[in-house]
Amino acid sequence: MLEPWAYVGSEPAASAPGKQVRVLVLYPQLTANYGDRGNVLLLQRELEDRGCDVCVEEHGLGDVLPAAFYDAYLIGGAMPHERELIANDLRAGMAQHLAQAVDAGSVLLAVAGGLAALGDAGVLPVRAEPGDMEPAHAYAKLLVPGGEGELLAGYQMHAERYYLDNPRNALACMSAGYGNNGEDGTEGVRINNAYGTTLHGPALMRSRWLLERLADDILRRRGESGVDDA
């Protein structure tokens, strides 16, 4: 029997010398409820397939702030109590680090309760309010100028309603399901290389284009050749 979240596929490509990518997983002990750890493993494998040596580290409550920016940061979904603990810890200094890292071009992927915690701490322009929404399968189209984008798919487990300071910062528009709040048709948030979604699944398993985009953004930040500007 496979271990949880074991990857099934071809062997990764050999890593190019000096081509190391550093990934920081935020509060993994508090965000393990919905299988979002799979996003970490999928991104790691995608980067390895592109010839990268991937170093994955973890940051928990009370840990020392990183001395330098990572190439990517990931945070999964969290229950309300864990979300509060995370938000309080973020306010102690990690929120400022993340905001500066994103401004410097680092990639961030936040899911559901982790996204809400980042909003609570002021890292991303999103707020979560109490709600009564039910679990649902969801589909959304990526927002792109002048046309329809790729399909974003997953399932939603949040009762809260998520609101963006500016709906134009949504990652996608809903095709089915309720997205951020069931009212304005938005799903997730995107600010530069920071992506947030309410979808589990894990999201990167069901939406390969998003997995590839994150990897592209990471390599573009590092100045690697062979990545077209989007």
List the predicted regions and their residue ranges.
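Pocket-forming structural segment of enzyme catalytic cores
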Residues: 120-188
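Beta-strand-turn-beta hairpins that frame and shape the catalytic cleft
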Residues: 18-21, 146-152, 190-195
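A glycine-centered loop/beta-turn motif at secondary-structure junctions
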Residues: 181-220
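N-terminal beta1-alpha1 cap of cysteine-dependent amidohydrolase-like domains
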Residues: 1-96, 100, 205, 212-230
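Structural motif
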Residues: 72-76, 109, 196-198
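Glycine-rich nucleotide phosphate-binding loop and flanking beta-alpha elements
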Residues: 80-81, 115-117, 161-163, 203-205
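Glycine-rich beta-alpha junction loops
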Residues: 27-29, 159-161, 201-203
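Cysteine-nucleophile active-site neighborhood
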Residues: 79-146
